Amino acid sequence: MNFKYIVAVSFLIASAYARSVQNDEQSLSQRDVLEEESLREIRGIGGKILSGLKTALKGAAKELASTYLHRKRTAEEHEVMKRLEAVMRDLDSLDYPEEASERETRGFNQDEIANLFTKKEKRILGPVLGLVGNALGGLLKNLG
């Protein structure tokens, strides 16, 4: 009689433990899904902000190019224009990263590719903001 109770209690404990493990796995998978969704939302927002920033920078660079185009330029202004043209090419390559860096990314895994594009964006956007700021400052100084 004692043996039947021991087996019954052991079975109840084992089934309760199995249910708790299953519930833990479900809650972990639900958390993973929620984290992934929030990461997608953050990436989407970041992509939209970056796209807007690129559009604004392209517009500013084109405006500066058209301003400098119709008058004689000094050597310094010529160098700024060369840099702006290079920046415009780099910004265009960010719009189509598959085509622009197809040769660069052969043989890399996905993490390395993501790091490469992040580094490329930082490498491009840092000098671009400085260049645009300097060019706008010089333009305002000349106008003022």
UniProtKB/Swiss-Prot annotation:
Signal peptide: 1-18
Tissue: Expressed by the skin glands.
BP term (GO), one: killing of cells of another organism
Compartments in which it is found: Secreted
Superkingdom per UniProt: Eukaryota
Classification via Pfam families: Bombinin
Phylogenetic classification of the source organism: Eukaryota, Metazoa, Chordata, Craniata, Vertebrata
Keyword Secreted tagged: yes
Gene Ontology terms: cellular component: extracellular region
Residues of the propeptide: 19-43, 73-122
Modification sites for Leucine amide: L143
Keyword terms: Amidation, Amphibian defense peptide, Antibiotic, Antimicrobial, Cleavage on pair of basic residues, Cytolysis, Fungicide, Hemolysis, Secreted, Signal
Function: Maximin-3 shows antibacterial activity against both Gram-positive and Gram-negative bacteria. It also shows antimicrobial activity against the fungus C.albicans, but not against A.flavus nor P.uticale. It has little hemolytic activity. It possess a significant cytotoxicity against tumor cell lines. It possess a significant anti-HIV activity. It shows high spermicidal activity.
Annotated family: Belongs to the bombinin family.
Keyword hit for DNA repair: no
InterPro entries, alphabetized: Bombinin
Chief location of this protein within or outside the cell: secreted
Protein name: Maximins 3/H15
